[in-house]
Amino acid sequence: MAVHKEVSFVAYLLIVLGMFLYVDALGCTKECGNLGFGICPRSEGSPTNPICINCCSGYKGCNYYSAFGDLICQGESDPKNPKACPLNCDTNIAYSRCPRSEGKSLIYPTGCTTCCTGYKGCYYFGTNGKFVCEGESDEPKPYMSTA
């Protein structure tokens, strides 16, 4: 009989622990955030369709390449605290490769996005332009047709 009580107690503990983990995994609440816009550094351009940027204004974490595939530089500007950079285009730069390659680089308006529902690697700013947070959610993978 004591074995049954121990098993029941252990099962009860596992259920209670599982409920706490489940509640924690539910994640984001449903209320809307008060975010003005978001920036998600993305890969842009190609050897045949170059971008207009320079190393100073390029995003940290992104690499910038020539039309021949030579690395020109790594981006120097932090989206959370951008550098004051000249607006000229470095004609040696044709394209960028960033850790995130899909989706929009600028999210405006943000709709009901919150810090919790915002995508990891994206930076969100208030309506006053001040940095608020980095997104916390994984971005859904784009649907790929197998046909």
Curated annotation (Swiss-Prot):
Residues 1-25 form the signal peptide. Sequence repeats lie at residues 25-82, 83-142. The keyword Disulfide bond applies. Pfam families: Prot_inhib_II. The record marks K30, E31 as: Reactive bond for trypsin. Belongs to the protease inhibitor I20 (potato type II proteinase inhibitor) family. This is Proteinase inhibitor type-2 T. It comes from Solanum tuberosum (Potato). The lineage of its organism: Eukaryota, Viridiplantae, Streptophyta, Embryophyta, Tracheophyta. The gene is PIN2T.
